[in-house]
A protein has these predicted regions:
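Conserved, well-structured core segments that form or line functional sites
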Residues: 2-181
Length: 181
């Protein structure tokens, strides 16, 4: 991993580089647990949040993944290299924060479902003030949002993904939700 030392709340915090994100989504999604999402606000203040819950969405074959319907203007960022943000609106009211993984033209993404003290993907983006303006932002070189490795280990649990009945039983039952307590 290309890591750059960053001052933080944790004994050693390291900014995560591109090679972390260009791996398969089923490797990256659990590896994101206990990583630190860092957000720099317009006033210069910086907040750090530990990731506690993720879900993997694995390309055009995954019926729950937005890319299952092919390449569109909405999903274009999913076809870019890992480390970019894919942000979209659901139900006309909640922004969803996803991190693109894999290589170019491998549309995979990890939904950030929870942070320490914030459970649920809509609550996460609302609490952090995240919206479409960060769609396509690159976590490896952005000065507004990035990830750090806290060096902390977690007991990671799995379960089927949430809220994807439309994808059918096969895809709904995949244990691609990762979380810790």
């Amino acid at each position: 991993m290309n890591l750059t030392e960053q001052p933080g709340l944790f004994p050693k915090s390291w900014r995560i580089g591109r090679d972390f994100f260009t791996r398969d989504v089923l490797v990256v999604a659990p590896a994101l647990i206990s990583k630190i999402l860092v957000l720099r606000h317009d006033d210069g203040n910086i907040n750090r949040f530990r990731i506690t819950e993720t879900e993997a969405y694995r390309g055009e074959e995954d019926r729950a993944c937005h890319a299952s319907r092919g390449r569109t203007a909405r999903t274009e960022v999913m076809y870019s290299t890992g480390g970019k943000l894919y942000i979209y609106l659901v139900y006309g009211m909640h922004w969803m924060l996803n991190i693109v993984t894999g290589e170019i033209n491998e549309p995979q993404a990890v939904l950030i479902r929870g942070l320490e003290n914030y459970s649920g993907p809509g609550r996460v983006t609302k609490a952090l003030g995240i919206n479409k303006s960060l769609n396509g932002a690159d976590l490896t070189d952005s000065d507004k949002i990035w990830l750090e490795d806290s060096g902390l280990a977690s007991d990671i649990r799995t379960s089927p993904r949430i809220g994807i009945d439309y994808a059918g039983e096969y895809w709904k039952s995949k244990p691609w939700r990762y979380f810790t307590f």
